[in-house]
């Protein structure tokens, strides 16, 4: 009981207790529904609830929570020339503006939850493979993908320096010979590289 009270006090010491609570619940609710949903709901309803909560968590983490808790935001810019790049917005861009400093509680809990949630989904993925639950594996891959993408983008945003572009590719596909129908494959490759 003391640990719950201490955690409650920690949340209250945050600069944005409501946003931090929404952020932590956004990471926890899909996991709880994944673990306990089959006891109360059909698998279809469980899938839908988990996917909707994951989508809401992705949106809120990307657009609201990161902006309020660590003063960073990212988006993926797709230009008309088949080039895609990350775009970042960070407190580092505005050193002259007297913005409120980042609360260490907000920062620690944001980054901890951002890295713990995908780790939990990866563990669930291994458990699905061991138990041969391939239908649930689809859900876990979706969940892990959304969480890992957010973690990866925020990691890049945190390391980003104003005036530089994000140039490290997510991964590089091997160079392929240019046959007639490989245009789609090269577009796929360009999706994972940033210019």
UniProtKB/Swiss-Prot annotation:
Keywords: Golgi apparatus, Membrane, Transmembrane, Transmembrane helix
Keyword rRNA-binding appears in the UniProt entry: no
Keyword Membrane: yes
Subcellular location per the Swiss-Prot or TrEMBL entry: Golgi apparatus membrane
GO terms for biological process, alphabetical: protein secretion; vesicle-mediated transport
One Gene Ontology cellular component annotation held by this UniProt entry: Golgi membrane
Transmembrane segments annotated in the record for this chain: 12-34, 39-61, 109-128, 132-154
Membrane-topology annotation of the record: Multi-pass membrane protein
Disulfide bonds: none
Superkingdom of the organism of origin: Eukaryota
Described function: Golgi membrane protein involved in vesicular trafficking.
Entry similarity comment: Belongs to the TVP23 family.
PANTHER family reported for this sequence: GOLGI APPARATUS MEMBRANE PROTEIN TVP23
Name under which the protein is recorded: Golgi apparatus membrane protein TVP23
Gene behind the chain: TVP23
